[in-house]
Amino acid sequence: MRQILFAGAIGLFLTLVGTPLLIKLLARKGYGQFIRDDGPRTHGSKKGTPTMGGIAFILATIVAYLLAKVITGEDIRYSGLLVLFLMAGMGLVGFLDDYIKIVKQRSLGLRAKAKMAGQLIVGIAFAVLSLQFPNSMNYTPASTRLSFVEDFGWSIGPVLFCVWALFMILAMSNGVNLTDGLDGLATGASVMVFGAYTFIGLWQFQESCANADNLTNPSACYEVRDPLDLAVVAAALMGACFGFLWWNTSPAKIFMGDTGSLALGGALAGLAILSRTEFLLAILGGLFVMITMSVVIQVGSFKMTGKRVFRMAPLQHHFELKGWSEVLVVVRFWIIQGMCVIVGLGLFYAGWAAKK
């Protein structure tokens, strides 16, 4: 428990203090946001706002995790390192994308094939490594069995698992990327989901099969390799994003950029895969799914019928064009995300209670 508290507090402190320093550095170098001409007119004032702010919470999360381990004297686990690797790797792809947008003033950044290649390399490396490093109970960080609130009984094999893991990583990283269109929206939503995974990791640790002899209901235990370590990473991410939100909320002093959005999406996917809650992530991260589906519906409808369902996609811009203020959209979408987290945690607990 002390690890979780230290990780969250350190992550919060580092981004609260470190983000304004990053803002000054990025502003001095002229690394400002490039605004597309086809977006809402109210976004014109955002042009030039420092971007690549994801650097702040990526570094803060890594430092917070490591310091929490040093302070408490606890061992560093493979599961935590794998999530940090996935987060940093996806963040690096996003950083290259942001850098090209800024330096070359090209709104689309990396070429689609190059961006996809980078995400695939990082994702495949994570998927392969997550099936290594068995512990004394022969648990590896990930499992080849699909999961909702825990693993299902059948395995899909390592090859299909890698394909599935890649799908999750790409879907979540791009889902957060699509959500990051309004000040504080993606950051605030991510704080809620990381908070949920902090709780899930702690609960799984207390009900771990490694402690089955001490449990009142051993049949409901969790076969997760390092649940407490995942909770520490999630707490570090929650704290770091919460501190970043101070500077990212409207009117934003800095944007996370693709550096941040791809990193957060990767971290969410990694936590879901390693905590055996893969399908549950679709509910816990319901806002990201909803916004992603709005783009799929918009593109599909236009290609098939020549008509658009929404005034603009992603969904948050549709409501802006209907006359909602940016802050109103963000707060209402946060409420939706909060309800998704409540439902997701309720289902997680129900899955455990049903086995009592």
Curated annotation (Swiss-Prot):
Membrane-spanning ranges: 3-23, 51-71, 80-100, 114-134, 152-172, 185-205, 227-247, 254-274, 279-299, 333-353
InterPro entries on file: Glycosyl_transferase_4, PNAcMuramoyl-5peptid_Trfase, PNAcMuramoyl-5peptid_Trfase_CS
Protein name: Phospho-N-acetylmuramoyl-pentapeptide-transferase
Coiled-coil residues: none
Name of encoding gene: mraY
Molecular function terms, GO-annotated: metal ion binding; phospho-N-acetylmuramoyl-pentapeptide-transferase activity; UDP-N-acetylmuramoyl-L-alanyl-D-glutamyl-meso-2,6-diaminopimelyl-D-alanyl-D-alanine:undecaprenyl-phosphate transferase activity
One GO process term, biological-process aspect: cell wall organization
Location(s), subcellular: Cell membrane
Pathway connected to this protein: Cell wall biogenesis; peptidoglycan biosynthesis
Cofactor: Mg(2+)
The keyword Amino-acid biosynthesis belongs to this UniProt entry's keyword annotation: no
Purpose: Catalyzes the initial step of the lipid cycle reactions in the biosynthesis of the cell wall peptidoglycan: transfers peptidoglycan precursor phospho-MurNAc-pentapeptide from UDP-MurNAc-pentapeptide onto the lipid carrier undecaprenyl phosphate, yielding undecaprenyl-pyrophosphoryl-MurNAc-pentapeptide, known as lipid I.
Catalyses which reaction(s): UDP-N-acetyl-alpha-D-muramoyl-L-alanyl-gamma-D-glutamyl-meso-2,6-diaminopimeloyl-D-alanyl-D-alanine + di-trans,octa-cis-undecaprenyl phosphate = di-trans,octa-cis-undecaprenyl diphospho-N-acetyl-alpha-D-muramoyl-L-alanyl-D-glutamyl-meso-2,6-diaminopimeloyl-D-alanyl-D-alanine + UMP
Disulphide bond pairs: none
Membrane topology designation: Multi-pass membrane protein
